[in-house]
Amino acid sequence: EHKTKPTQHSVKELQGMGVSPNIVVLRCDEPLEESIFKKISMFCNVKPDCVIENITLPFLYEAPLMLERENFSSIVCRELGIDAPAPELGEWRQMVESIKNRTGEVNIGLVGKYVQLHDAYLSVNEALNHAGYALNTCVHIHWIDSEGLTEADYKEKLSGLDGILVPGGFGGRGIAGMILAARYARENDLPYFGICLGMQVAVIEYARNVAGITKADSGEFDELCPDKVIDFMPGQSENIDK
């Protein structure tokens, strides 16, 4: 059973601060009963059609279409006194339908040190998905903790991937696993995308295993490294602690 009291209380608090909403948007997981709209309209002092239902959707980009079905844009324009034409959502609707009906699939391993918190790589996640939208492909992201990759098991853990992405990060934790991921991609001819730190570990891997510079490393991880293939720019290291 849906409760209206929390919404009523929130609106009352706003009104107590001098803010009287013209429109109330109700977030919900399931369709609301008509009585809910009537209660919110009555007790929150908003017009009946200004109580808008915003149901949880499986796909975020359907939200504008759903809100338009609720006449949200015309109601907003009316409340603001704006005379505007109806939005043209034809191309958006086509985009949503094409995304929902993608035919291709690809498996990308995202190898990082913060994978327990996916939001740490939110921009990378969304970029991969958008690339898939443009190419009619579902991108399946496999979150792989670089600290969990070892010489004994990295091949097994990275098998079955179509590509590997190593994103940015700081510090030496998990670097060994990232280097193994770069090595696996190179030796198995897999597409490899290194962003910032990810590109640095690719350079280190190549230097060690192809160029024969066995002690190659980054000055960020080992200040005393005799063969720094990555290092801070002059003056940059002085600002690291800051």
At which residue positions do the language-model features occur?
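N-terminal beta1-alpha1 cap of cysteine-dependent amidohydrolase-like domains
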Residues: 1-242
